[in-house]
């Protein structure tokens, strides 16, 4: 497999992977400066928790916030685990 | 008018000390008075790379604290009389370097020499910031490797904000020195190319120093590569870089051994 894949697979050159990764990373590091990055996530986490807490009681640990950066767009992923009994009461 | 040059990188092990010694010796061989200053307090190595480790009596901290005069701490190179070294302290704490003391020593060095070349410690802490603070020019030593490029980008940011020039609203003259470059691997796209690194960091290119056995051989015997193996490829790259620092306009190329197919293949015209 590895022999054949070495011949036939059109893998991306590692140097262009390196260049792309660096360009994406540095574009954010230059803008964010020192600790801007983790500050943004912390702030988002805090405010999202406040909004949710107004309506339902959710455990701090059940809220996951992730950021995934691409060259074209970045994705902010917010994952809130809602307690079982509440999902039944919706719309009441 | 003396020029203060800092050789810096952020990341360790990319060739700051090697490049300081090689550029210093290259500039000194052109007849200019050069001092190389080791700012890596506690981990000094410039003395060893320059072959002066057994001649160190006083060091930068002794001079900063007024325990020794500058002339007592300077070591004149035995092979090149226009080249001197000011070693760092190996035993003292780096907090012993005060901003005022360093400023005083730098002023005194500016009067004595044409070039004051400061070998920065790795990192972005106080030692690195003191080494760059008085710089008019900076050589950013970078390997074609992701972590080195990232750290160089960070250092460029510091040069634009934490130096005396930046505080006065001026710019430190920044130059990229790409070291440990392997043109064959770059051609196979296994290594970031010169163009890739230049595009990412966007500062002018001072030189490309190819990966070479001569660099280790020279440090083994305690001589800058531009003194120990002046015709070697890395030495030629450093000599050309030194001429560019002196203001000459020279085309940058990847130095190659012979003129032939490979020469044609790897020749650059940027």
Swiss-Prot record, chain A:
NCBIfam families: minE (TIGR01215), PRK00296.1 (NF001422). It comes from the Bacteria. GO terms for biological process: cell division; regulation of division septum assembly. The keyword Cell cycle applies. Keywords: Cell cycle, Cell division. Prevents the cell division inhibition by proteins MinC and MinD at internal division sites while permitting inhibition at polar sites. This ensures cell division at the proper site by restricting the formation of a division septum at the midpoint of the long axis of the cell. The gene is minE. This is Cell division topological specificity factor. Belongs to the MinE family. InterPro entries: MinE, MinE_sf.
């Amino acid at each position: 497999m590895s022999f054949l894949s070495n011949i036939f697979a059109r893998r991306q050159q590692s140097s262009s992977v390196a260049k792309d990764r660096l360009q994406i990373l540095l574009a954010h590091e230059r803008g964010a400066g020192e600790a801007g990055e983790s500050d943004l996530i912390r702030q988002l986490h805090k405010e999202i928790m406040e909004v949710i807490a107004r309506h339902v009681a959710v455990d701090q640990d059940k809220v996951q916030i992730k950021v995934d950066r691409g060259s074209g767009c970045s994705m902010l992923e917010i994952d809130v685990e809602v307690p079982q009994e509440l999902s039944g009461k919706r719309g009441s | 008018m003396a020029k203060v040059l800092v050789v810096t990188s952020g990341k360790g092990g990319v060739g700051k000390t090697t490049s300081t010694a090689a550029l210093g010796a290259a500039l000194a061989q052109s007849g200019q008075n050069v001092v190389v200053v080791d700012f890596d307090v506690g981990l000094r190595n410039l003395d060893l790379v320059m072959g002066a480790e057994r001649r160190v009596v006083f060091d930068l901290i002794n001079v900063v604290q007024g325990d020794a005069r500058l002339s007592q701490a300077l070591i004149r190179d035995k092979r090149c009389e226009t080249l001197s070294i000011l070693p760092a302290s190996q035993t003292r704490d780096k907090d012993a370097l005060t901003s005022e003391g360093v400023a005083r020593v730098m002023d005194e060095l500016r009067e004595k020499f044409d070039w004051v070349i400061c070998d920065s410690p790795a990192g972005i802490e106080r030692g690195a910031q003191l080494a760059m603070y008085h710089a008019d020019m900076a050589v950013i030593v970078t390997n074609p490797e992701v972590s080195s490029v990232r750290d160089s980008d960070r250092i460029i940011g510091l040069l634009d904000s934490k130096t005396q020039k930046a505080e006065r609203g001026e710019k430190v003259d920044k130059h990229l020195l790409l070291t440990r470059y392997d043109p064959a691997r770059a051609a196979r796209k296994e290594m970031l190319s010169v163009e890739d690194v230049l595009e990412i960091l966007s500062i002018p290119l001072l030189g490309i120093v190819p990966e070479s056995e001569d660099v280790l051989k020279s440090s083994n015997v305690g001589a800058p590569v531009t003194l120990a193996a002046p015709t070697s490829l890395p030495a030629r790259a450093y000599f050309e870089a030194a001429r560019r620092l002196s203001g000459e306009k020279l085309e940058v190329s990847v130095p190659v051994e012979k003129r032939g197919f490979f020469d044609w293949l790897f020749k650059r015209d940027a």
